[in-house]
């Protein structure tokens, strides 16, 4: 990226990376997930550093995820919490570290640690909808694992908020009300007016996606709090999972 092309730009938001759950986690796919995030971010950070003396962007909002925290049970996690263990934690640490050239050049760098984004056309919800719509949905495993979610509306608004407000470092992009997988399944079934009583044993998804993906994406418990957003006065459009799912699926507020 030619640094001159960045002159006059005030801020850059960079979220690119291969889909986490698009394919089975083979060794090559895991390497693709990592490198698609770190290499592009490193190149962008270097270009931003070179552009800064020329009048380039002052702000970089770079992608990350709550996978940074790993499987933590019922522990309440804030931006100050230490990293967890596992592949996704390793990816997030490397992804955030890839911005260091921009940080050293004096840009304000903020990392968007995003949770489960509720979108009908992509992500976890898009994969669950077909099962739940025909009455085959239910909790995964024990169902006690926490899911930290955010509506797509709030995700976009939070990214804009990170540009406009003087925040640097990690920012948890999740709604304040994390729920268990059982609660999520019941609420989704209610919104769709379908039963959600069929528990899904981990073996089924593991055969399709691989045990590593299932363990870290479906069975891991991550109870994350949006401390920076809430402390900075960010106004969530959706505090209720039911309300967020209704708007996402039916296109209108609850």
How does the language model describe each region?
Residues 1-39:
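NAD(P)H-binding glycine-rich loop region in Rossmannoid oxidoreductase-like domains
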Residues 30-32, 41-86:
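Conserved Rossmann-fold NAD(P)-dependent oxidoreductase catalytic core, especially the SDR/UDP-sugar
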Residues 83-88, 115-122, 142-150:
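Glycine-rich "substrate-gating" loop/helix at the edge of Rossmann-like oxidoreductase active sites
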Residues 93, 105-107, 118-127, 161-171:
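Glycine/proline-rich active-site loop of Rossmann-fold NAD(P)-dependent oxidoreductases
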Residues 100, 129-137, 145-179:
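Alpha-helical substrate-binding/gating segment
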Residues 158, 164-212, 246-254:
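Mid/C-terminal beta-alpha module of Rossmann-like enzyme folds, strongest
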Residues 216-254:
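C-terminal amphipathic/interface module of NAD(P)-dependent oxidoreductases
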